[in-house]
């Protein structure tokens, strides 16, 4: 049985200037800043955009770009088994409290997707 996708969790955007991006997304777009972003070792911010989130990440080097969208899932282990059965390459990130369990995969065009099982 195929694992379930619960919905879009967040869209992650690489930006050169986090404060400038925050002004746009908060002042112009009406998003609200979240206070629960873990320390990932690089500048960024998490925003609420209705029931979904926008994650801003400071990466000036396009080669290190982490732009992606994240699908919320209920069972990350089932997705790993699903990918293994289909020989789909993926990367499972170490668990970061507050960030949920994460698996990254690329579509055939090279777009990065994150599957995210939130901490509850």
PLM feature spans:
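Vicinal oxygen chelate
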Residues: 1-4, 85-120
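N-terminal beta-strand motif that seeds the catalytic metal site of vicinal oxygen chelate
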Residues: 1-19, 67-69
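A short linear hydrophobic-aromatic micro-motif
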Residues: 32-35, 56, 89-93
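Short acidic/glycine-enriched loop/turn segments that link adjacent beta-strands
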Residues: 39-43, 63-65, 97-101
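Short acidic/polar mixed-charge low-complexity motifs
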Residues: 52-53, 111
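Mid-chain, well-packed structural core segment of small domains
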Residues: 69-83
């Amino acid at each position: 049985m195929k694992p379930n996708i619960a919905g879009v969790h967040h869209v992650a955007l690489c930006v050169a200037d986090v404060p400038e991006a925050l002004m746009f997304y908060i002042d112009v777009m009406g998003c609200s800043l979240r206070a629960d972003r873990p320390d990932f070792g690089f500048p960024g911010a998490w925003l609420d955009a209705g029931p979904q989130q926008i994650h801003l990440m400071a990466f000036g080097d396009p080669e290190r770009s982490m732009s992606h969208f994240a699908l919320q899932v209920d069972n990350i282990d089932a997705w790993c088994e699903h990918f293994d059965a289909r020989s789909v390459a993926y990367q499972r990130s170490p668990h970061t409290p507050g960030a949920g369990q994460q698996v990254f995969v690329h579509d055939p065009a090279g777009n990065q997707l994150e599957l995210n099982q939130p901490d509850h």
